[in-house]
Amino acid sequence: MSVQKMMRVPRKMVGGRIPFFTCSKVFSGFSRRSFHESPLARSTYEEEKVLVDEIKQKLTPDDIERCNKLRNIGISAHIDSGKTTFTERVLYYTKRIKAIHEVRGRDNVGAKMDSMDLEREKGITIQSAATYCSWDKEGKNYHFNLIDTPGHIDFTIEVERALRVLDGAVLVVCAVSGVQSQTVTVDRQMRRYNVPRVTFINKMDRMGSDPFRAIEQLNSKLKIPAAAVQIPIGSESSLSGVVDLINRVAIYNKGDNGEIIEKGPVPENLKPLMEEKRQLLIETLADVDDEMAEMFLEEKEPTTQQIKDAIRRSTIARSFTPVLMGSALANTGIQPVLDAIVDYLPNPSEVLNTALDVSNNEAKVNLVPAVQQPFVGLAFKLEEGKYGQLTYVRVYQGRLRKGNYITNVKTGKKVKVARLVRMHSSEMEDVDEVGSGEICATFGIDCASGDTFTDGSVQYSMSSMYVPDAVVSLSITPNSKDASNFSKALNRFQKEDPTFRVKFDPESKETIISGMGELHLEIYVERMRREYNVDCVTGKPQVSYRESITIPADFDYTHKKQSGGAGQYGRVIGTLSPVDDITKGNIFETAIVGGRIPDKYLAACGKGFEEVCEKGPLIGHRVLDVKMLINDGAIHAVDSNELSFKTATMSAFRDAFLRAQPVIMEPIMNVSVTSPNEFQGNVIGLLNKLQAVIQDTENGHDEFTLKAECALSTMFGFATSLRASTQGKGEFSLEFSHYAPTAPHVQKELISEFQKKQAKK
C-alpha cells in the first residue's frame, strides 16, 4: 500500500477547503523512499549534490548570475504529441518569431523548427533543431537554449545527442493517448543522461482528453512520482484556461494568439477539485522531499514558496516531475510552462558534468562552468550547411571566442574557430564569444560527433552519447552515373548520423546502407534525390541477423603452411562458449601458462577473433554473445608469426562454432499500434498473422493501443497492411527489443540461401 493512499482518509469540507492534516503515527511507520524511489539512487544524488556545491564555491558572482539566468532545455515526446507546435508557441510568446505557423506547412510556411522541406511535407521532425530565446519573469530576463527533437523512433539518435548536452527537458504528453511507446523510450533516454523534466500534458482541447489518466500513467508506466500543479478550466472544446494549484489562481489566455495572460479568482465549481489536487501535490512531495516530509509530520501547511522550493529540489533530484497542462494549438497554458522552466529546471551550475583527464590515467574531473577556467566543449552534432560543415558545440567550461585555436583531444589536431554562431533553426546569428553553459555552432572544424575540444592547456575527454545498433539494411545503387555525388551524400550522412551506416559488399558488389528502420532509410534516399540530384534504386529491406552458439565446444587447431623458405605455423587450444550476460557482448580471453604463446601472438589471436566475429560461419552475419578462451598452444621457432596465429584463431573459431549447436538470432521488435476502437479486431488479426505475441491492450475513449513483440522479418510492408485494415486511421511504432533464435525452418532456409550464393561465386 502506498503512503499516499494511506493518507487519503475521508475529510470534512471546511469553507470549501480541505484542511491540511494527517495521521503522523501511520506515516512515520513506513519508509517513504521505498514507495517512490528516485530513478537515480538517493545516495548517488546526495553525493552528486555535495560535488555540485563544491563546484559552486569556485564560481565568481558574475558566473553565478550568468548561470542563474540560463536554461538548456529540450522538448521531447512521442510522435504527434505536439512538440513542434508547442515549441512554435514558445518562440512566439518569447518574441523570437513574429507569427505562428503550423506543422505540415499548411500555411505554405511551416513550423519554424521544421526547416527541411521533408519535415514540413510529412509533418514530422527529422533532425533536432536548436534555437534560443529570452523570457521575462518577475522583472528578470532568462535565456533559453532550446532543442526540439524528433518523436519517431527511427530518429532516436537525435534525441540521444540532444539530451547528452541538455540540463533539463519538457516532456510533452498527449492528453488523449497518455504515455505511449516513444514516451517510455524518451523517459529511458532522460534517465540515461540524468536529465530532470517538467511534464506538459498537451491537446487538452481534444475530445477524450483526460489529464489525470495521463498523470496516473506517468506514475505507473514511467515509475516517476508525478503530480499536477494545475487543473483545467473547462474540458475538450470548452477549455478556457488553467488553475494554478500552488497560488490558487485561475489563468486565462487572451488576445488573438493567447499572448495576453489574465489572472483571476478560481471558479467556485472548481475549488473542491483544486483543494483535492493541491493536497495530493503536497502528499506526493512529502513522499520524495525531506523538508516537505518534516512539515507533513508536524502537520504544518506549507507556504506557496515552500511548495515551489520542494518542487525544484525534487525535480532537480530527478525524483519527481511537476505536471502542467494546456493546448499548444489552442494557445492555452504555454506561458506557465516557461515560468516552470525557470522555477523548477536546473541552471548549468546545478548540474554535475564530468570529464576524464587523458593526461592523468583518465582520472575523473568535475567541470566548473566558469569563464576563467580552461575551455572544454563537446561537439554533439554535425550538419552540412551552405558554408561547409556546421559543428554544434556545448561549452561546459571556460569560454569559446571567435579566432581562438582549440584542440581536438581525440586527434590532437589544433583548429581555428573562424566563425561562431547561435542557431535559430536554419538561421544563424554571428557572435564573438560564448560562455560556459551555452550552446553554439562553428564552421570549418573537421571532427566527429562526440569529440571533445579544449584550449590545449588540459587534456579532458567527455563521454559520448549512446548509439544503438542498426536493425534494417538495404542495397542501394545510383541510377545515374554520378558516383561522385552519391559518395559525397553517403559520407555526409554518415558523419551527421552515427546510426546511419554504409558498407560495400565485395561479394554482391553492392553498397549496403543500414539504419534504425524503413522510414529512417527512406528519408536518406529521398534526401539524396533532393539535395544531391541522385536517383537511387533500392533493394528489398534486409534484416540484420546475428549468429550465436548454445553449448561450449573445445578446439585444438594447428595452422601449417610450407611454400619454400619460412612457412607459417600456429597452434591454439581452448574453448568456445556462449556468454550468459548479454550486456557483455563478445569476449576474448587468454590463460596461457609458461609463455607457450608469446604476447605479440596472443594480440594477433585477439585481432583474428574480432575479425571472424564480423562475419559468422553460418550466413555471414555478425556473431553475438560468444566467448573464446585460448589456454594453450604451440609455436615454431622459425615459422611462427602474427599472421599464423591470427589465421589459426579464425579457423579454430569457425570449426568450433559449427560444433557448438549454432543458432541464427533475429531482431525482435516492440510494436505499438494505435487505432480507432472499431478496428481492434482487424489489428489483432493482422498481428496474429505475423505471429506476434500480444503483451498488452489499452482501450481509451475512442481509440485503443495494442503492444506486442514481433520478429522484424515479418514487419516489412506492415504500414501498408495496417492502412488497409484501419482505413488509413491506424498508426504504429517499432523499437528494437532484443535478439532471439529464429525458428528451425527459417534458420534452415537462411543457411541454404547463403550456401547457394556462395556456390555461384
Swiss-Prot record:
Q: Which SMART domains match?
A: EFG_C, EFG_IV
- List the pathway annotation: Protein biosynthesis; polypeptide chain elongation
The residue ranges of the tr-type G domain are: 68-349
Cross-referenced InterPro entries, in alphabetical order? EFG_II (IPR041095), EFG_III (IPR009022), EFG_III/V (IPR035647), EFG_IV (IPR047872), EFG_V (IPR035649), EFG_V-like (IPR000640), EFTu-like_2 (IPR004161), G_TR_CS (IPR031157)
One Pfam assignment: EFG_IV
State if Disulfide bond is listed as a keyword.
no
Where does this polypeptide localize? Mitochondrion
Transit peptide limits: 1-42
Modification after translation is described as:
The precursor is processed in two steps involving mitochondrial intermediate peptidase (MIP) and mitochondrial processing peptidase (MPP).
Presence of keyword Mitochondrion: yes
Q: Which positions does UniProt annotate for GTP binding?
A: 77-84, 148-152, 202-205
Matches recorded under SUPFAM superfamilies: EF-G C-terminal domain-like, P-loop containing nucleoside triphosphate hydrolases, Ribosomal protein S5 domain 2-like, Translation proteins
Q: Which GO terms describe its biological process?
A: mitochondrial translational elongation
Molecular function (GO) terms for this protein are: GTP binding; GTPase activity; translation elongation factor activity
Q: Which controlled-vocabulary keywords does the entry list?
A: Elongation factor, GTP-binding, Mitochondrion, Nucleotide-binding, Protein biosynthesis, Transit peptide
A GO cellular component entry from the record: mitochondrion
Function, as annotated: Mitochondrial GTPase that catalyzes the GTP-dependent ribosomal translocation step during translation elongation. During this step, the ribosome changes from the pre-translocational (PRE) to the post-translocational (POST) state as the newly formed A-site-bound peptidyl-tRNA and P-site-bound deacylated tRNA move to the P and E sites, respectively. Catalyzes the coordinated movement of the two tRNA molecules, the mRNA and conformational changes in the ribosome.
Its family remark reads: Belongs to the TRAFAC class translation factor GTPase superfamily. Classic translation factor GTPase family. EF-G/EF-2 subfamily.
Output this protein's name: Elongation factor G, mitochondrial
Q: Which organism is it from?
A: Saccharomyces cerevisiae (strain YJM789) (Baker's yeast)
